[in-house]
């Protein structure tokens, strides 16, 4: 059963790679994750100081940050504070709570694990049947982040 699922995932991935152009509607040019946090500053320590992202945009909200854009190696992440959402799009306030789960593939799994420091682990290190080594943590904003590397790219753990 696991082999069948792994083959299905592989085929789906190959098909997704082949389907680069849509024939209906406008084209999709980019997808960027937007996560919410009660306060952005604690999340910056995790994403910037520990994981090496760079803050390229910041929007203040009073004496704190209301919104930031972080980048690293072509990946982009937006973080918006609850206060920022309330001011910017008040209809979204009830949804602006930590509820995201991000899945991020990395090149050096062991280095990543070291960089996580004391982040609360919610999924202990595991090797999956689909060939990934993973660890899941809760980032300071309350969102879940699963980090993964292809087994052949990670050292034995």
Give a label for each model feature.
Residues 43, 47-48, 116, 139-142:
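Conserved active-site tyrosine of GNAT-family acetyltransferases
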Residues 144-147:
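Short glycine-/small-residue motifs
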Residues 1-7:
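Sec-dependent signal peptide recognition
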